[in-house]
């Protein structure tokens, strides 16, 4: 495999195991098939950023890492030190967390999402302009060219999620995705009164932007959400920023 993130083949094998564990963690804890998206960004200095968003609970990046830390240590896999948990960064092979390049860019993206999510569009940003390189999309994003071809994550014969890994061209520093989903079991929610079909359908636009090495922004915009049907959602607060350090 290409040395995308500046790590060795051994690191990539360990990475695959970490991805497998994180997938199992994600879907062991899924709730009624809600819209859930996990994004793993692999930087050129070997660090890994993990972001999770779902439509029912807003999971903070630090809380996400603590949960993954507990799960992976239970599996006797790579553990996370306190610095990595607090800074929301994972360094492979116990690398020195203080030694990274300030100009590091994401070189590969892993997207893991629940069965209720459909990836609609992919956009990439070069510098400050947004463009869609058709030839690259056809090569690396088969659902854009030939239909849905993700890796299926199954348990007891049932599809519990999808996973897709792709590499980013060196000249691109940002990626934007539009996703949508519908709850598998909308009747499980206590809506209290009659609602039209739009009250049980949720569409989300997920935008993941890498502004620089220290800052990534994940924006989740919800459409067609009834406050009565979804009282737990703060529909007035759509944008979230995840600071990787004090630098911006």
Curated annotation (Swiss-Prot):
Protein name per UniProt: Polyhedrin
InterPro entries named in the record: Cypo_polyhedrin_Cypovirus1
Record-level GO cellular component terms: viral occlusion body
Keyword field: Glycoprotein, Late protein, Viral occlusion body
Top-rank lineage group of the source organism: Viruses
Organism for this UniProt entry: Lymantria dispar cypovirus 1 (isolate Rao) (LdCPV-1)
Function: Major component of the virus occlusion bodies, which are large proteinaceous structures (polyhedra), that protect the virus from the outside environment for extended periods until they are ingested by insect larvae.
S-S bridge residues: none
Annotated glycosylation sites: 28, 77, 86, 237
Known partners and oligomeric status: Forms crystal-like bodies by self-assembly.
